[in-house]
């Protein structure tokens, strides 16, 4: 499909097919697929045979099938995975990809997704500037996920294992006779076939693994099974940190670091694991994802760069009190928590006010007859005299605006009320009455005593 004129070409045989990069959401990687060409591609190909003299183009399809062909192919940048592109631009020193003169600007959503991934991998910072790790990743001719895994493997003397894992992830799974998703089974099978030089369906995977070893100057293959499944999980987590998953209540159910749920078949050996790292999965929006390739992992093997610390202050409605915990997390997954002994007063008050908007009916005595009577009195006066512009003291409004009136009543001579027994003692009627200006209180007492 080149636009150059090639001397001597008189005949073109067009298969009607071409190889294109397709993004696979299961592995979050791109791979080549053979697919049908569009009509503009067919015209371009036919033109090769008639540039300098009459020529012939043999099209290996029927004229009747042309109505099924799209008229024009869409630019690859519209649907491509942009992680490598964004990283390359950052390596050139440009943090804003839209400062380049694109013929077709990349979709903003795809750019943001790529930036988020590269930030998670540690290849760029939050400002879009490339990091030292990102510089190394950018020099490797593979997807940033794979490059990150192979580079990190060097620090753990696991480079050959990382090359085998990368090859297994990129190709179609040869183990069609098992529903077990443990990728370690594939690594063992690959090494066994490679040692016996009976590759068969493993040939392409072995070739890719060899290419990766050559890329990192580690030419000798490893055909032993002297690797730990947890090593496999650790390497996968370097490439897919958002796909670390923790077991939840039901057997075979896990929650990903991004908050989504996935499920393994109950017969899968990985159901016994507390933590797994997933290399290949498929998940539809709102549905439980299906895992294809994964490995066990232990928290001690987590990359410290993806662990975040935070103080979590929240209202526990079951216990009826504030719970203050210092937490270590990977995404939305809790690794470890410990109680916080000293909490800022403002943070306590803010937490109670936020909880009031959601649980306020059970936290305070809103159903007290005196509270209901006061609300009815004020509502009647507001109905009779709208010109008074009386404040809204309906329960719904007061709950949603608790931060405006409640803080004063939560501080009892320096002691902040933080449990339901203390909050039930707050005089809600008096608190509501004090919201109303004094001159309007007099009018209410006179019109609705």
Model-found features: residue ranges?
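Residue-level signal for threonine
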Residues: 1, 38, 130-134, 143, ...
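Conserved two-lobed SF2 helicase motor
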Residues: 1-5, 13
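Conserved segment of the helicase C-terminal RecA-like domain
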Residues: 8-11, 17-69, 85-87
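Extended active-site and interfacial segments that coordinate phosphate-rich ligands
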Residues: 15-19, 27-28, 32, 38-40, ...
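C-terminal accessory/connector segments of nucleic-acid motor ATPases
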Residues: 59-194, 204-225, 230-248, 252-266
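Acidic, serine/threonine- and proline-rich low-complexity intrinsically disordered segments
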Residues: 158-253, 258, 274-447
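Amphipathic, interaction-prone secondary-structure segments
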Residues: 264, 446-449
């Amino acid at each position: 499909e080149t636009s150059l004129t090639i001397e001597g070409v008189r005949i073109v045989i067009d298969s009607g097919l071409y190889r294109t990069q397709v993004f696979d959401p299961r592995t979050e990687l791109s791979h080549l697929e053979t697919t049908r060409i569009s009509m503009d591609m067919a015209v371009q190909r036919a033109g090769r045979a008639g540039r300098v003299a009459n020529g012939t183009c043999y099209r290996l399809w029927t004229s009747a099938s042309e109505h099924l062909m799209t008229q024009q192919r869409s630019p690859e940048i519209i649907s491509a995975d942009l992680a490598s592109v964004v990283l390359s631009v950052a390596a050139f020193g440009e943090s804003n990809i839209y400062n380049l003169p694109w013929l077709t600007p990349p979709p903003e959503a795809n750019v943001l997704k790529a930036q988020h991934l590269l930030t998670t991998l540690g290849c760029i910072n939050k400002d879009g500037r490339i990091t030292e790790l990102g510089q190394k990743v950018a020099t490797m001719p593979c997807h940033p996920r794979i490059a990150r895994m192979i580079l990190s493997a060097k620090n753990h003397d696991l480079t050959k294992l990382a090359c085998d894992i990368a090859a297994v992830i990129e190709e179609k799974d040869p183990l069609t006779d098992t529903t077990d998703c443990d990728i370690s089974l594939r690594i063992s099978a690959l090494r066994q076939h490679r040692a016996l030089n009976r590759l068969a369906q493993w040939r392409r995977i072995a070739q890719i693994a060899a290419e990766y070893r050559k890329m990192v100057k580690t030419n000798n293959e490893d055909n032993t099974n002297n690797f730990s499944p947890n090593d496999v999980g650790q390497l996968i987590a370097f490439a897919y940190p958002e796909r670390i998953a923790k077991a939840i209540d039901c057997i075979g159910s896990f929650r990903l670091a991004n908050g989504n749920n996935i499920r393994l078949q109950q017969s899968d050996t990985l159901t016994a694991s507390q933590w797994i790292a997933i290399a290949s999965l498929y998940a539809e929006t709102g549905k439980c994802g299906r895992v294809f390739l994964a490995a066990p992992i232990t928290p001690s093997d987590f990359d410290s760069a993806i662990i975040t610390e935070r103080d979590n202050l929240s209202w526990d409605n079951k216990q009826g009190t504030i719970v203050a915990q210092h937490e270590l997390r990977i995404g939305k997954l809790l690794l470890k928590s410990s109680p916080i002994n000293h909490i800022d007063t403002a943070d306590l008050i803010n937490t109670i006010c936020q909880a009031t908007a959601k649980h306020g009916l059970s936290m305070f005595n809103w159903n007290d007859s005196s509270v209901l009577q006061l609300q009815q009195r004020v509502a009647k006066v507001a109905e009779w005299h709208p010109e008074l512009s009386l404040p809204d003291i309906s329960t719904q409004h007061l709950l949603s605006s608790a931060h405006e009136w409640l803080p004063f009543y939560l501080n009892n001579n320096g002691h902040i009320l933080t449990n339901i027994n203390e909050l039930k003692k707050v005089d809600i009627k008096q608190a509501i009455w004090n919201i109303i200006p004094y001159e309007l209180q007099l009018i209410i007492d006179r019109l609705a005593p």
